[in-house]
Amino acid sequence: GKTTLVKQFSKEFDYFISLNLEKEDADLFRKFDNVGAIWQYLCLKNHIVQDKNKSVLLFIDEIQEEPIAVAMLRYFYEDLPYVFVIAAGSRLQSLTKKHLSFPVGRVEYITLRPFSFLEYINAKHGEQWATLLRETSVPEVLHNEMLAEFNTFALIGGMPEAVTEYLNTNDIERLSPIFNSLLKGYNEDAEKFAKNIE
């Protein structure tokens, strides 16, 4: 989902740095007390020559795991305006329990959701079908085919990896490992979230 999307987007930049704050990367925000020092360290570690003419994307994943990183977002914006930062997390709502908020006026929010049926139709059949579905009632001649598509979509669900695999293979049986991985991820997130509630 979000990580795949960010990696695709990173191809638009000269440099890409990815941090995961569920791992040892969180220590970085405890070791250094300002974004300048963090940035210098990241450039050295990633063999990046600091050049304001080169575009850089910094991806901070699971930012809710390190409240200091959330607070520092403001300073990335103010002190390093040439560094583009994407912060993401699967449980950002946990920040409100810690009485932390993202810097006002310096953060844009984007919510990722699973594919809708309309997006699925657009991906599978193109904009013409999506426009037909959006703007008119489905002609009788396409009704059964559209109903079959809806039934397939209901079986696949809207998670991007599952939709992509199905569109590439047209084989629902190949989705089983993807569903198992998603289920495992949901279970792990539920356990982490439950620990935060306690």
Where on the chain are the PLM-derived regions?
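Conserved lysine of the Walker
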Residues: K2
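Short glycine-rich substrate-engagement loop in P-loop NTPases that contacts/grips substrate
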Residues: L19-V56
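Conserved P-loop NTPase "ATPase switch" module shared by AAA+ and STAND
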Residues: Q50-A69
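Sensor-1/coupling segment of RecA-like P-loop NTPase cores
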Residues: D79-L100
